[in-house]
Every structure is written in structure tokens, then in C-alpha cells.
């Protein structure tokens, strides 16, 4: 498993999400996870069935979710990720395993380092992922690492190495951070689709 999500009571929102990575460390935010929480609490009657907007307390703040409902079930959940913050120069150079890389640091509730590569399919993430995650530049908290290929101005291909979990099939906050970094770098237009291992 990539980790564990607990749905708990909240005094400030409809519910509170606690998220733990595969290594047992507590995660700050999980974009896809908070969307799953929204679907779960709606579908299981933990919030009023008249609601189309719900709030979830996270360590990254309260997130607002918009629900699309069909036949009494949430079929789509979107989340306002909140404000992002640039956490590096644009771009910043870094040496990992003796090789120079350029990255863009973005925080969307949790830290991400976005690296641009010629192709994502041939990367040996099991070997290089930990070196990026645990690099001294990101100490002591570590970093989620996205490897991005810019297919065109409206399409990114992404693989992700998540801190505490390793390579995962998808990462909502990582996709958000990658699109923002790519816009700031001038690589994509104001909207772009991100292809991951299991979807877009």
C-alpha cells in the first residue's frame, strides 16, 4: 500500500483526514486521498446528502471539495488545493549522485521538487528516487519528487517518487505542482493534462 488514511471528527470542518505514508511517517496532504475522503463521507452518509460542497481538515489546512452527484453517489470530486508557494529559484541546480539536475521547488501543502527529463519510461526510480527524496537540500523533511517529460504545450508525462512511500502510480499534489512549475518555466499553457501510470 502507498499508505493509510483515517477519517476523523473535526471541530472546524465536515471531517478531518489523517494520512500516513508507507514508512509510517505522517503525511501533510494527499490530493487524491482527500478526494477519496470526500467520496467516502458522502457515499456513506457521514455528511448531509444535500451537500455538494464539503470541507476536510488536513495538516495543510482546510480543503474545500466540490462533489458531482449521480444517483445518490459522488461520481466526481474536485479539490481546491489552495495557494502554492515557490520554494526554489526558477530553476535551481542540484547535484544528485554526481550528476547535475535542474529542478523547480513548489509547495502545494506539501513539498515537491520537479525535474524535467527527456523521457520518463526508462528512469530507474528505485535507484535514484531515494537519492532525490533524501538529498541534503531538502533536509530534514525530505521531498516528493516528480520527473516530468513535456510532451507538448498541453501535455505532461509524469512519474513520481513520494517521500515515505517510494514510487506511486499517481500523485494529485504532484500533478498540481508539476503543472504550476511548467507554467512558470514557460513550458506549457495555462492548462495542461498530466499523464500518470494509471490515468490522467
Indicate residue ranges for each PLM-predicted region.
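Short, solvent-exposed secondary-structure boundary/capping segments
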Residues: 73-81
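Short acidic-hydrophobic surface loop/beta-edge motif
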Residues: 54-56, 91-98, 104-106, 192-194
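Internal active-site segments that recognize and position negatively charged phosphoryl groups
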Residues: 95-122
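Short, charged, solvent-exposed linker or helix-capping segments at domain edges/interfaces
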Residues: 88-92, 125-127
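Structured loops at beta-to-helix junctions and adjacent beta-edge loops in soluble globular domains
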Residues: 10, 59, 80-82, 106
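A glycine-rich beta-to-alpha transition motif near the start of alpha/beta enzyme domains, typified by
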Residues: 1-73, 113-200
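Ligand-binding beta-strand-loop-alpha-helix segment within the catalytic cores
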Residues: 82-88
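Glycine-rich, charged/polar anion/phosphate-binding loops
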Residues: 89-90, 98-102, 132-133, 144
Amino acid at each position: 500500500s502507498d499508505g493509510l488514511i483515517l477519517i476523523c471528527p473535526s471541530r472546524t470542518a465536515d471531517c478531518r483526514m489523517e494520512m500516513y505514508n508507507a514508512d509510517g511517517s505522517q503525511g501533510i496532504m494527499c490530493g487524491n486521498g482527500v478526494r477519496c475522503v470526500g467520496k467516502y463521507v458522502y457515499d456513506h452518509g457521514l455528511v448531509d446528502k444535500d451537500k455538494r460542497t464539503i470541507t476536510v481538515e488536513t495538516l495543510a489546512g482546510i480543503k474545500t471539495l466540490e462533489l458531482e452527484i449521480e444517483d445518490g453517489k459522488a461520481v466526481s470530486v474536485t479539490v481546491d488545493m489552495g495557494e502554492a508557494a515557490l520554494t526554489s529559484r526558477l530553476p535551481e541546480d542540484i547535484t544528485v549522485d554526481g550528476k547535475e539536475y535542474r529542478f523547480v521547488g513548489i509547495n502545494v501543502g506539501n513539498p515537491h521538487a520537479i525535474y524535467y527529463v527527456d523521457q520518463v519510461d526508462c528512469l530507474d526510480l528505485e535507484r535514484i528516487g531515494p537519492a532525490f527524496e533524501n538529498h541534503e537540500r531538502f533536509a530534514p523533511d525530505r521531498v516528493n519528487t516528480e520527473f516530468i517529460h513535456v510532451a507538448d504545450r498541453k501535455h505532461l508525462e509524469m512519474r513520481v517518487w513520494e517521500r515515505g512511500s517510494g514510487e506511486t502510480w499517481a500523485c494529485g499534489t504532484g500533478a498540481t505542482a508539476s503543472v504550476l512549475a511548467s507554467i512558470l518555466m514557460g513550458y506549457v499553457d495555462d492548462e495542461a493534462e498530466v499523464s500518470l501510470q494509471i490515468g490522467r
